[in-house]
Amino acid sequence: MKNYTYASLLALLLLASTTWVTAQNVLVNTTKKYNNIKQIEVESGWLDVSYQGGEGTEVSVEAYLESNIADQDIVFATLGDVLKISYKSSSEKYNWNSKSKGYIKITGPVALALEVSGTSGNISIQNLESKLTTLQLTSGNVAATQIKGNLTLTATSGTLIAKEVDGDVNARLTSGNTSLDGIKGAVDYGSTSGNFTAKNIGGLLNVQLTSGNAKLENVKELGTMKITSGNMTAVNAGLGSKTQFSGTSGNFTLQTPSDLGAFNYTLRATSGNLRVGNTSKEKSLDINNNAANTVRGNITSGNITITN
């Protein structure tokens, strides 16, 4: 009977301890409004961040932070027309039982410079106009829609999405997938591992993938296409003075609206087939059309196919 009593008491103590550890407290729950803000800088930590541009000039920030770990805060500071929002934590007590949730939701004018940097979570930006918008995340998802101006996206792992950008896009992702659609300017993209999809690109497109596949559609001009291991498929993608293909293992398959006779071609494959229009060869294909520009390609194991 005593053993049963002791066991019951121990179970109750463990349950109480677990309940105490996992109890969540609201640390931040506030809405702040600002006028005459031209630039916002956010250091979000693990918090989700969103920005919605709209009519008016007032900036409104809704911040919420709930956690079972104390010593966390969201700090606001203004310096002239710059608003700085920072997640702060002085605690190192995180463990397997840590539970937290929170966000920073911002609404404000369309014309505003924005820079967001975080460690994890999600970043979602819509309807923004600035010379440069910078979004950086260690792990998580980054999405930007209806952006006027240049856009920089960076993440170590996760997903990058950009749509309707009236400017250039520079994107870097270590591991994960990226989707771009409706980019009026040039695109420079690099990734170590993952898949890349790009549609309706109005400028020069450069792609560098260590491992993964690239699917391209409606691209004004292809630049450097470098894929160490993987495949590139392009439909309605233009050739230009900077077009070149480089790969170790995989295939480059391109359907282009460009005049094939307006370019020279120097293509090489250690093991594989090479084709331009109706002309195909193994290992080496040289076509001299007395053109001003030459399309170059080199693949160790795989094929390069360029057709109309």
What are these regions (language model features)?
Residues 1-308:
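Intrinsically disordered, low-complexity terminal regions
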